[in-house]
Amino acid sequence: MNELNKTPKEIVKELDQYIVGQQAAKKSVAVALRNRYRRLQLEENMQQDITPKNLLMIGPTGVGKTEIARRLAKIVNAPFVKVEATKFTEVGYVGRDVESMVRDLVENAIQIVEKQQYSRVYAQALKKANQRLVKVLVPGIKKEQKQAGGNQFEQMMNMFNMAQQQQEAQEEVTEDIRTNRRTILEQLEKGLLDNREVTIEIEEPKKTMPAMNNGLEQMGIDLNETLGALSPKKKIERTVTVKEAQELLVKEESAKIVNDADIHSEAIRLAESSGIIFIDEIDKITSKSQQNSGEVSREGVQRDILPIVEGSQVNTKYGPLQTDHILFIASGAFHLSKPSDLIPELQGRFPIRVELDDLTADDFVSILTEPNNALIKQYVALIGTENVSVIFTKEAIERLAHIAYDVNRDTDNIGARRLHTILERLLEDLLYEAPDMQMGEITITEAYVNEKLNDIVQNEDLSRYIL
């Protein structure tokens, strides 16, 4: 729970490492997150009455709406899911129902809890995995196996995963084999055998049937688990490096140690208390955006979303989940509509409104250079793998920023995503030729940027198709 104990200023500081500007939005999400921590410090009867203040982010595409929510979830290691409001259909029509967003959130929570539980038992699982691996690398002497002689009971026992126990009983281990196994175990623990190939037997991954499962999952029934319990676990052989084999076996042994029921109950609790659901393109399901359209009205989708945002119980295959304390963050450009076009009940469930600013040329300069793993740092690192060093001059970066701003202004405004298309166009030849170039240093100057991009920028029709 320590990750929740961050002050709003600390949260904003961490968001600043990845997102340029948008201080009002960062401040609002930081306060919403801190309020969760504050609620958990209160008495239990008061906790139940304090619900999250959901946010509505308003701003054009590419200004950081999704990234703010995604980074926020990573900062506190909270279950997070992003959905598009336009993907849902109201009850009675073919398509995804709105409750699927909650089920997706639980799946994400399962992954988080599973990772935490597996790391807790890692040392124990590694020890068991190494023991299995040593037996594969230094096999025992096989005894002569007695024929089953048509004994149906023995054959049935073999089907139900008894073959492993029989194999161990039919192996003879001499003193030399024990000595070799001790030696191999020492080498294994030191990582000296990591690149050696080995053939291991592991359980076959579960096959899922999503198309059949959706309806049953709404009733809290997991068809895959039901069918899996009826059929025996199959083993498959895989030839991998010792390092990869170790990872596969550790995962398998961890699953045996950890109790699935504990993972499921903890994941439900985590999703209920810390889950974040980001609903994108909520402006596309307003009545205003549906005018003169032949599509089914999306107002029904708004009414289906309403009880989930208000707080209701959703059945998942891991158990029922209450949505009362899940934080919902909705976003939309609202070019053709406005927030007041949402149904009044839904408007009231998003009391905090944050308008994100359009990006300026100065913002683009910052985006290219300041964040952790900024775009220019990414391209320099990629080309650096070919032993070619690339340096961007300050003037070149400023010119790139102004080009991105001008193209956004004169064509469609896609925000920071414009920088991706411009950099790809600028570095296209270099990315193609780099493997055949000798080691050296290349400086990207303002003149080089103009040479590569000016003709396209000046021709508005070309800009629309290429940039």
From Swiss-Prot:
It is found in: Cytoplasm. Keywords: ATP-binding, Chaperone, Cytoplasm, Nucleotide-binding. ATP binds at V20, G62, V63, G64, K65, T66, E67, D280, E345, R417. InterPro entries: AAA+_ATPase (IPR003593), ATP-dep_Clp_protease_ClpX (IPR050052), ATPase_AAA_core (IPR003959), Clp_ATPase_C (IPR019489), HslU (IPR004491), P-loop_NTPase (IPR027417). GO terms for molecular function: ATP binding; ATP hydrolysis activity; peptidase activity; proteasome-activating activity. Its main location: cytoplasm. The keyword Mitochondrion does not apply. CDD domains: RecA-like_HslU (cd19498). Pfam families: AAA (PF00004), AAA_2 (PF07724). GO terms for cellular component: HslUV protease complex. It comes from the Bacteria. GO terms for biological process: protein unfolding; proteolysis involved in protein catabolic process. NCBIfam families: hslU (TIGR00390), PRK05201.1 (NF003544). ATPase subunit of a proteasome-like degradation complex; this subunit has chaperone activity. The binding of ATP and its subsequent hydrolysis by HslU are essential for unfolding of protein substrates subsequently hydrolyzed by HslV. HslU recognizes the N-terminal part of its protein substrates and unfolds these before they are guided to HslV for hydrolysis. Belongs to the ClpX chaperone family. HslU subfamily. HAMAP family: HslU. A double ring-shaped homohexamer of HslV is capped on each side by a ring-shaped HslU homohexamer. The assembly of the HslU/HslV complex is dependent on binding of ATP. PANTHER family: ATP-DEPENDENT CLP PROTEASE ATP-BINDING SUBUNIT CLPX-LIKE, MITOCHONDRIAL-RELATED (PTHR48102), ATP-DEPENDENT PROTEASE ATPASE SUBUNIT HSLU (PTHR48102:SF3). This is ATP-dependent protease ATPase subunit HslU.
